[in-house]
A protein has these predicted regions:
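C-terminal substrate-recognition "lid" of short-chain dehydrogenase/reductases
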Residues: 2, 115-118, 208-234, 238-239
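Canonical Rossmann dinucleotide-binding motif of NAD(H)/NADP(H)-dependent dehydrogenases/reductases
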Residues: 3-32
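Short, small/polar-rich loop/turn modules that mediate ligand/substrate recognition or access, typified
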Residues: 84, 170-175, 227-229
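Substrate-binding pocket helix/loop in short-chain dehydrogenase/reductase
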Residues: 94-95, 99-107, 197
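Active-site helix of classical SDR
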Residues: 118, 154, 162
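Alpha-helical segment proximal to the catalytic Tyr-Lys
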Residues: 123, 167-168, 225
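Residue(s) in the substrate-gating loop at a strand-loop-helix junction
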Residues: 138
Length: 240
C-alpha cells in the first residue's frame, strides 16, 4: 500500500473529488481526516471508511477552525504527513457582475483557505521530518475563460502560492505541489461538458474521480519524494 502509516487531512472531502480521494487514501493504508463545510456530508464519508477516518465540520477560511483540525488530528492520529487543499468555491460571474463581497469570499476560500492550511500543518510536518501539501487548482488557472473572473483569479493565485511555498518550505522537507483537474465525473460536472467531451477533450471522455485520486495518492506517497514546486494537469490533454 502506497500510503501505509501516513496521516492525511483532506478538505472539501464530503463529496465529489475530495470524497473519492479520502476513500482511495484509506484503501492505500492512510488514516484520513475528512473536513467539509457540510458536516453531515463529511461524517457520511468517514462512516463509510470506518475506523481509519474521522470527520470534522470545517470552513477553510476560518483560522480558528484550522487550529481545531490540526489539534484533533494530532490528538487522534499523532502526526500529519499530508494535506490536500481540495476545498474550493466555484461560481460563474463576469468582471462587471463581480462585486467586492463576492471577490473576497472567493479569495477567502480558494486562496486564504489553502494558505491557512499550509500555515497550520507546517509546524507538525516539520516536527515529523517533512510532509506533502497538495493544492488543487483548476484548468482556469492555465487559461482564461470569460465569465469566471473571480474564480479564475483565485486559482491563478493557488499556482503562485504553491511555487513560493515549495521554495520556503523545502528546507523543512515539506513538498508543495499543484494538481489541476480537467473535466472530472462528479455531481458538480456541467452536463454540457460531459455531453461534448468527444469534441472538447482529445481523449474523448471526461476523467473519473478515481483517476484523479490516484494522482493525488502518487504525489502524497514516498514515490514522489523529490517532486516539489511542480504542476500537473490531469485533463486528458484538454489544455496543453
Amino acid at each position: 500500500m502506497k500510503l501505509a502509516g501516513k496521516v492525511a487531512i483532506i478538505t472539501g472531502a464530503g463529496s465529489g473529488m475530495g470524497a473519492e480521494e479520502a476513500r482511495v487514501f484509506a484503501d492505500e493504508g492512510a488514516r484520513v481526516v475528512i473536513t467539509d463545510i457540510v458536516g453531515d456530508a463529511c461524517r457520511k464519508v468517514a462512516a463509510e471508511i470506518g475506523a481509519n477516518a474521522i470527520a470534522i465540520e470545517h470552513d477553510v477560511a476560518d483560522e480558528a477552525g484550522w487550529t481545531r483540525v490540526v489539534e484533533t488530528t494530532l490528538a487522534t492520529f499523532g502526526k500529519i504527513d499530508v494535506l490536500v487543499n481540495n476545498a474550493g468555491l466555484t461560481k460563474a460571474d463576469t468582471f462587471d457582475n463581480t462585486d467586492v463581497a463576492f471577490m473576497r469570499r472567493m479569495l477567502d476560500v480558494n486562496i486564504i483557505g489553502s494558505f491557512l492550511g499550509m500555515k497550520a500543518v507546517r509546524g507538525p510536518m516539520k516536527d515529523n521530518g517533512g510532509g506533502a501539501i497538495i493544492n488543487i487548482a483548476s484548468g482556469l488557472a492555465f487559461t482564461s475563460l470569460p465569465g469566471y473572473f473571480a474564480y479564475g483569479v483565485s486559482k491563478w493565485g493557488v499556482r503562485g502560492m504553491t511555487r513560493l511555498g515549495a521554495k520556503e518550505l523545502g528546507p523543512d522537507n515539506i513538498r508543495v505541489v499543484t494538481l489541476t483537474p480537467g473535466a472530472i465525473e462528479t455531481p458538480a460536472l456541467v452536463p454540457a461538458v460531459r455531453e461534448n467531451a468527444a469534441a472538447m477533450i482529445p481523449m474523448g471522455r471526461v476523467g473519473g474521480a478515481d483517476e484523479f485520486a490516484r494522482v493525488v495518492v502518487f504525489i502524497a506517497s514516498d514515490d514522489a519524494s523529490y517532486v516539489s514546486g511542480a504542476e500537473f494537469l490531469i485533463d486528458g490533454a484538454m489544455i496543453c
